[in-house]
Amino acid sequence: MSSALPPFRPSLVSDPLSARQDPSLPGILPVSAPILIEDIGPRVSDGRYPIKRVLGEGVVVSAAVFRDGHVPLAAALLWRRSPRPGEPAGGRGAWHEVPLTQIEPGLARWRARFDPPAIGRFDYLIEAWSDDWAGWRHDTLIKRDAGLDLSLEVLEGMALIEATIARIDGTDQAADQGLLSSWLADAQGLETAGGRATLMLSETLDAVMARHPDRSGAVRSGPPLSVVVDPPRAGFAAWYEMAPRSQASEPGRWGTFADCAARLPDIRAMGFDTLYLMPIHPIGRIHRKGPNNSLKAGPDDPGSPYAIGAAEGGHTAIHPELGTLDEFRALVAQAGEMGMDVALDIAIQCAPDHPWVSEHPEWFEFRPDGTIKYAENPPKKYQDIVNLAFWGPHRQELWLALLEVFTFWAEQGVRVFRVDNPHTKPVPFWEWLIATVKARYPDCIFLAEAFTRPPMMKMLAKIGFTQSYSYFTWRTTKAELTSYMEELVEDDPADYMRVNFFANTPDILPFHLQTGGRPAFMQRLVLAATLSSVYGIHNGFELCENAAIPGKEEYADSEKYDFKPRDWNAEGNIKDLIAKVNWIRNENPALQAFRTLRFFRADNDQILFYGKMTGDRANIILVAVNLDPHAGQGGLLWLPLAEMGLSDGQPFIVEELLSGTRLEWTGSPHHYWFDPATNPAAIFRITP
């Protein structure tokens, strides 16, 4: 194991114009170009962190570009692949260029778009310059139309053409050089200034001159900004979480990887594309937890899979009851053949009998009496877990060992990692680790399971986590859902934080699922799957399991501490609804995006009405959900006709995709009724 951490140097970005001092002027007078480039977007924390996109999603960049006076400007968006760690600067290739278009002249706003061609990290910046030829042509046209003498203007224009001829370089541009020389000679052969001006003001000449601007005085916006381009499933996916040991078809034995593989067709039939496994490693025996988190475990109690490590191995080992490494690889391969990724749960914590405790005691914290310090979140105590000393004197060796955990599983074919409680580990550690892993495996996806304060959740997203857990689990009212979603899609997080909406987790059985019965499960499924483009459920959700420890948001007899074999086709399941909702998501591109979410008016506080549409309006989806699982609700739905490109009297086709109903509506509003037991939600596809 190397004793030094691989280098990681985050890019600090700001965009003031660089100034140089002219020694002939007083020291307080900087000499700089007259062009200013301000308010570049998108950017995160003034460019300190990259924005995020998925492959196939373009990056629209805008800025204010202006200068003193009335000289016309031109600008371009420059982009290229970012250098990889250890790669020389020249290895990333030349800048690609896209012209900027002025979209709001009164505000000096310019905009352009580029489409990164691959997964990875890309840099971008703006370059602007004064367009002297456009300025000359604009002023000369006005003077000609006013009947003014153009003698001096002609001389100025000729000088600009001569400078362009001299500036053109390269055999591929020789044709333009010849054209300009011919035009110049023809103009010089004319006797009158008016005749020369007419020739020089031709649109054909203007097009040639525009191809060769004088950019010697061009200004760049400063150090480049960056975008991380992730695989499409970083932005659109449906996760199914399972406890592998609970997948046995009969009670009383451990589930195996073979049992997990046997369930793949059923999971895929429900429309899930990411199979998320709770930790699969050996489980500690010291202070092992019993059922319902009890402190006493019986001889046959399996313990918590989050108490990682025992005599059989640690974070790169597999619990022997689950199977072998070859059988795990076979599960990953079989899932891949069915169009599914396998996500692995990585919990950076150790059982007291994890091999690292005896092999590397310097990686842990000990109390004054010599006992190892176990994990606490007062008043909660986790006697079966000990934490690592991330800032201890041996942190380099520890950090490298943890890096090897992720790269080991990546080598087994895993490209998706759900990280347990990352907010309890140092942010610099995650920034370094994720960047290092993605330098080797750029298609890796990291999900941050961090239910914590918003600044920490946002920071984890900024420094590299691909997806984030969210507060959706606890947002239940119309006001709460609307406010929270608008914060995510319209405010600062939109460019860097992708939320994965889990309707439940092994740890969390929300009160609304405990009390709302089957209608609550149907309601929350539709909300999670249509509000966000990435969502998930923990196994048992499809069976509407809601037995809880009284007064707590915790499952009774949780499979975190026990086996839980099930009849996966038990009466009352909502598997058909899940399959239908996932089919709708896959068939409608509007639902595969997140930042296009908008809320619309519904005249009932128990009805949430919202929608998404593609930029070209080719796919328009509106969703209405009854938030009351106990009673039917109805109300007027006010459709956004203008946003959909419809006039008030124009008829349009409405398909309610959950029921298959097809309607013809005209105008807005329209009344709709929701029965929590039979139609707790409606998903409308609008066709003008």
Swiss-Prot record:
SMART domains named in the record: Aamy (SM00642)
Signal peptide (residue range): none
Site label Transition state stabilizer, positions: D507
Catalytic activity: alpha-maltose 1-phosphate + [(1->4)-alpha-D-glucosyl](n) = [(1->4)-alpha-D-glucosyl](n+2) + phosphate
Residues that hold alpha-maltose 1-phosphate according to the record: K289, Q349, D384, N421, K560, Y561
EC number(s) from the headed UniProt entry: 2.4.99.16
UniProt keyword Iron-sulfur present: no
InterPro entries with a match to the protein in the record: GlgE (IPR026585), GLGE_C (IPR049171), GlgE_dom_N/S (IPR021828), Glyco_hydro_13_cat_dom (IPR006047), Glyco_hydro_b (IPR013780), Glycoside_hydrolase_SF (IPR017853), Ig-like_fold (IPR013783)
GO function term, MF aspect, one: hydrolase activity, hydrolyzing O-glycosyl compounds
Uppermost EC category: transferase
Protein name (Swiss-Prot/TrEMBL): Alpha-1,4-glucan:maltose-1-phosphate maltosyltransferase
Organism: Rhodospirillum rubrum (strain ATCC 11170 / ATH 1.1.1 / DSM 467 / LMG 4362 / NCIMB 8255 / S1)
